[in-house]
Amino acid sequence: MAAVVSTAGIIYYLMNEVDFAKSKQRELENQSMSLSEDVASLKKLKVGLQSELLDREEKMQTVSDRLSDLEKVLGVDDSDDATLESRLDTAAITSSVRLVLLNQIPNGSPVEKSRMSSDYGRRINPVTGKSEFHRGQDFSAPKDTAIYAPADGVVEVVRPSLVKGSGNYLRLRHSFGFSSSYSHMNKFAVKMGEFVNKGDIIGYVGNSGLSTGPHLHYEIRFVGRSLDPKPFVNWGINNFDTIFTKVGGVRWESLINNVEQRVSAQLQLSSLKAAPLMASSE
């Protein structure tokens, strides 16, 4: 009899434990659902804040572009390009400095085997039919043609959008105040915050946003101001000097001096590291 009572007690105890475990499980599931809802809400808030930030950046860029246009109308030129050639001795720029510049500043075409379909400057917008300033270079190419990074950089913006103006949009932040952006893409090959090297595939040509056909809208900016991309697209080691006279608004002399100092410091550091090795081998 005592054994039966003992067994019944154990069963009762185990049943209570099961009920308690089930209750705990339901509680944890409810907490998990609540946390999932919180995470989803935070993600939605993050997307909203990112979108708002990008909208404000675009408005700031528009204001900057309008100021630049006004300066051109008024004849204001703070780049002092007229005396640049006399101050900048391009022949004295070493091969090391040239390689640094060509790795860090956008150059070459971001799309191979493409056709330049619309240049930088005032034009009639093919979608709206209105006259407006086109702040980039368009490249016509088949859908899913690879887009390459024109210089080392970090992915600053990745914004998916199939219907809004720029469509699927990506922006790279390069060195020395330069940035490049890519609109109407079909898909991305990189994520925000990712570092890329010159020549890496960053995405593919598409027809997203306000677009009349598959193409890439390519922009280059310096400290937020748009520049004509064509001189950069045509720039390379064989015509290295041309960029300094074709692109205004950049203090090239100051930039090159900065790079020369960096390269010199790196060479000195390399020499110091090599000195003990040479001494030990003698």
Residue ranges, per PLM feature:
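Conserved positions in beta-strands of structured domains
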Residues: S117, V154-E156, N186, G203-G206
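Active-site/binding-pocket entry motifs
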Residues: G121-N125, V155, S161, S226
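Generic structural motif
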Residues: S109-S118, T145-V155, V196-G199
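Extracytoplasmic
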Residues: T83-E85, V111-K113, E132-G136, P142, ...
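Short glycine/threonine/proline-enriched tight-turn/helix- or strand-capping micro-motif at secondary-structure
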Residues: I93-V100, S117-A149
